[in-house]
Each structure stands twice: as C-alpha cells, then as structure tokens.
C-alpha cells in the first residue's frame, strides 16, 4: 500500500534489525518510503536487506550509532545518493538491566552512549540537510526493553 504523503521520501531508521525498528522500517517501505535501516553488524544489515528485498531504494547498512564520524558519513552518503533525507527514526537502544548497586560504570556508560548520546549525534547529523530542504521529521523511540 503506497501512501501518497510519504511515497518517495527517504528515511533513516536506526536499530532496524528486529522488533520495533524492523516494524517501522517495513511499514515505511510499504508506504513507498526509501528506507535505510541500520544494524550493528553486517549480519544484521543482511537481515534488513532480506526484509526489505524488492523495495526500491531500501537497504540495510552497518552503523555504530556511537561513532559521530560514521553517522555523519552515512547521512552525507544518503543525501548524495537520494538528494534528500526526510525522516530520521532514532530507534537503536540497549539495556544492561541489573540492580544499580551492581551496575558497572562501563555498562552505565554504554546505555547512555547508545540510548541518549547517539540520539543527539544522529539528530545533529540530519539537521543541516533537513533545514536546507525546509522539511524533515525526527522521531525518537524509547522502550522498556531497550532493544
């Protein structure tokens, strides 16, 4: 079902390998959006490619959302390839659930880096092209599960 409102737009969906992110990526693709879904591994990117197979302009890519340079490079590549980036869905997330008194600093830092700092980094990366095209949507997803 193509949706004339979204058809032809370009979306970047982080954490698109499974769960909420996979559902968002597939739903957007079904509505005619060119979806670039991110995964933390090449295997995950392959799963996204399989899920979006046959949909023009859709693909999975590997991205460390905690790497600012990689995020900037991906956004630049998307804009260069498609001429625009209309939608960012910040969905990537992790959890390191345990009692606070047992949580290690490294685990806490990893959760904040992925669930908070990466949202800022990716949002910052898309702001310039979105402002230049005078259109853009940033959607931030949270979950109790975190992944």
Kindly label every feature range from the protein language model.
Residues 55-57, 77-88, 96, 107:
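A glycine-rich helix->loop->beta "capping" turn
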Residues 99-100, 107-112:
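Substrate-binding pocket helix/loop in short-chain dehydrogenase/reductase
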Residues 31-47:
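Conserved glycine-rich Rossmann-like NAD(P)H-binding loop of the short-chain dehydrogenase/reductase
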Residues 123-124:
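A short, exposed helix-loop element centered on a Lys and neighboring polar residues
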Residues 10, 17-18:
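Conserved glycine-rich cofactor-binding loop
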Residues 62-73, 105:
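The beta1-alpha1 cofactor-binding region of Rossmann-like NAD(H)/NADP(H)-dependent oxidoreductases
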């Amino acid at each position: 079902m193509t949706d004339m409102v979204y058809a032809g737009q370009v979306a970047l969906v982080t954490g698109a390998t499974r769960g909420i992110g996979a559902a968002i990526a597939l739903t957007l693709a079904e509505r005619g959006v060119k979806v670039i879904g991110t995964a933390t591994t090449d295997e995950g990117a392959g799963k996204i490619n399989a899920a979006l197979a046959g949909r023009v302009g859709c693909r999975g890519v590997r991205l460390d959302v905690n790497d600012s340079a990689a995020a900037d490079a991906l956004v630049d590549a998307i804009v260069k390839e498609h001429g625009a980036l209309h939608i960012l869905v910040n969905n990537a997330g992790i959890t390191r659930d345990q009692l606070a008194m047992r949580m290690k600093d490294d685990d806490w830092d990893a959760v904040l880096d992925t669930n908070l700092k990466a949202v800022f980094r990716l949002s910052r990366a898309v702001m310039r092209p979105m402002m230049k095209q005078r259109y853009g949507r940033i959607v931030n997803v949270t979950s109790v599960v975190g992944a």
